[in-house]
Amino acid sequence: MGRREEMIAKIKELMLQPERIRNIGIAAHIDHGKTTLSDNLLAGAGMISEELAGKQLVLDFDEQEQARGITINAANVSMVHNYEGKDYLINLIDTPGHVDFGGDVTRAMRAIDGVIIVVDAVEGVMPQTETVVRQALREYVKPVLFINKVDRLIRELKLTPQQMMERFSKIIMDVNRLIQRYAPEEYKKKWMVRVEDGSVAFGSAYYNWALSVPFMQRTGVKFNEIIDLTLKGDNKTLRQRAPLHVVVLDMVVRHLPSPIEAQKYRIPHLWQGDINSKIGQAMLNCDPKGKMVMVITKIIIDKHAGEVATGRVWSGTVRSGQEVYLINSKRKGRIQQVGIYMGPERINMEAVPAGNIVAVTGLRDAMAGETVAEEQIEPFEALHYVSEPVVTVAIEAKNVKDLPRLIEALRQLAKEDPTLHVKIDEETGQHLLSGMGELHLEVKLYKLQKDWGIEVDVSEPIVVYRESITKPSPIVEGKSPNKHNRFYVVVEPMPDEIYQAIKEGIIPEGRVKDPKAVAKKLAELGMDYDIARGVVDIYNGNMFLDNTKGIQYLNEVMDLLIDGFHQAMDEGPLAKEPVMKVIVRLVDAQVHEDNVHRGPAQIYPAIRTAIHCAMMKAGPVLYEPYQKVIINIPYEYMGAVSREISQRRGQLIDMRQEGEVMTIIAEAPVAEMFGFAGAIRSATSGRALWSTEHAGFKRVPNELAQQIIRQIRQRKGLDPNPPTEKDVCPLF
């Protein structure tokens, strides 16, 4: 039996023993060394050759990732590790650290139970570290810590062992502070990472060594010995004395939970169904004999197999030929092939039981986040994405005959990545592609041209603004065109605390299933409980409440009213941009008794006009997306970089100096950040390292707002003059 066959046989055997499985991820700030760590873990476990590991980046198997040197898609591999005489199956998902790809991180967190947080010993805890830790803890994923690039502290910064220990302590404190802040109440203490119990390891992924207290106690290897070997440059002995994969995977097996353990506390939080039902119990207990339930976390388009859906099996067993329900998209499907990953390679299996990460083909309409089950059940709660699309490009096929293929390609791209929004502009016939940032869109467009061979013309990037209001409106009446239905609404600005709670998933978006529970949360955040009890729907950071009493037939049109509310929120009155932070309260209504007189053609315009007119009376304003920029540069470029930022309406938030290196943290409007990469490279002769992340929305200064509204309206083929209250409010 060859090495590969042996490996597959071992994986097949361990798949059936969930207590021996660990589903883990690696998450970190960009360039802190995640992918190098993943590769060296694979090499140690015998999945790739050691010489190549760290240089070859197995998990970065997309050509673009190799070229850019960053991880774009969360890849998935399975490997075997022996700990205290027993074999364990470790399923590892590598996630991107670049902010534009935050969606991949969110999806990967759903599939795993534990995560290795990687922090660069030189840079310490960075903003993106905080984002990934928050995402992990929100999905009830337990963390351990690996402090990477320790070789740089020894070689470049020439720190003494004492100084290094101080630096480690600070990183551990910072990570524990994040765990304290974001972990679920009952795990704030339990999940803190500690050097003494081995839930912290430190080392160098690139040079393939690591240490932890349990390892040092067991083997007698001392830190001073490692320092000497590093200074001598004896990397071979380093690897042999303190092998990275042994230290890190021991930490994983010892401190991160098996599916059996994790599902007991994760399922009640991720799934809203009845825990005491048969299927609820099967998931709690990770029972391979129960009914099958899996959640898809990623769709990959494979040249040979078509769409491959990767996901986590919570209960039952996935088999080829199985008839299943796609719960969210309300349709049936049939699973064709079933397999698991070994590196980028997919290996077919007859069946994959609960507790494993599976790859299936045949589910043609599945999206990331879809719940797939053998019978109709409550879906898992929606995945929370940390930031929303803020940049749009318009694309057209250069060749008209490519149009049908372009539409199909865009559909596929949007399926692979739900944080990408695709829309056809009805008026201009252009396809609008919105993403998290410039890089996100660049990567997707490259994929479009390379994988599909479609030549496209791409517009300059356009920023997606938001419309909102500054004060409560008076009561506004909206009439249906036939005058038989009337709706009376009030709009109010949404308090920041409530908006944050929605964005962080504490108050879930969508139709409200349990108004009392949501009202209780809203009341805790300062809303009047009696008003909050009317909450019906939460949509893109806006809220619709029914505060009427005993209106006849209102229930019959409630679905239409909610659709109309969505339409009003998708395109605000100022420039048809999405609306944010608005509370719409229905306070009174008259609804015609006859079904015929209260269809969509009557209800939509009535509620839409009422909401837009109320917004015009509530001090309408424009918000623009901001980015946080973190730049590391040699001290002498300080002035050039500050100038570059202030020219872009940016402001400096913080500056730190460590040795020769300055870290600048600034915020600037996304609209001013296009072309920043090139500008900063030339300003610093290519010596700047920088990353960005979404920093929310801020109000556009008044003097700029009118000009921007004109530009947007002109681009959309509307009358460029900003509308007045008279234009929006009908004369009744």
Curated annotation (Swiss-Prot):
**Where is it located?**
Cytoplasm
Query: What are the record keywords, sorted?
Result: Cytoplasm, Elongation factor, GTP-binding, Nucleotide-binding, Protein biosynthesis
Which amino acids does the record list as binding GTP? 28-35, 94-98, 148-151
What residues does the tr-type G domain cover?
19-260
> Got any disulfides in this one, which pairs?
none
Query: Diphthamide: which positions carry it?
Result: H597
* Single GO MF annotation: GTP binding
UniProt-recorded name of the protein = Elongation factor 2
The organism encoding this protein is Pyrococcus furiosus (strain ATCC 43587 / DSM 3638 / JCM 8422 / Vc1)
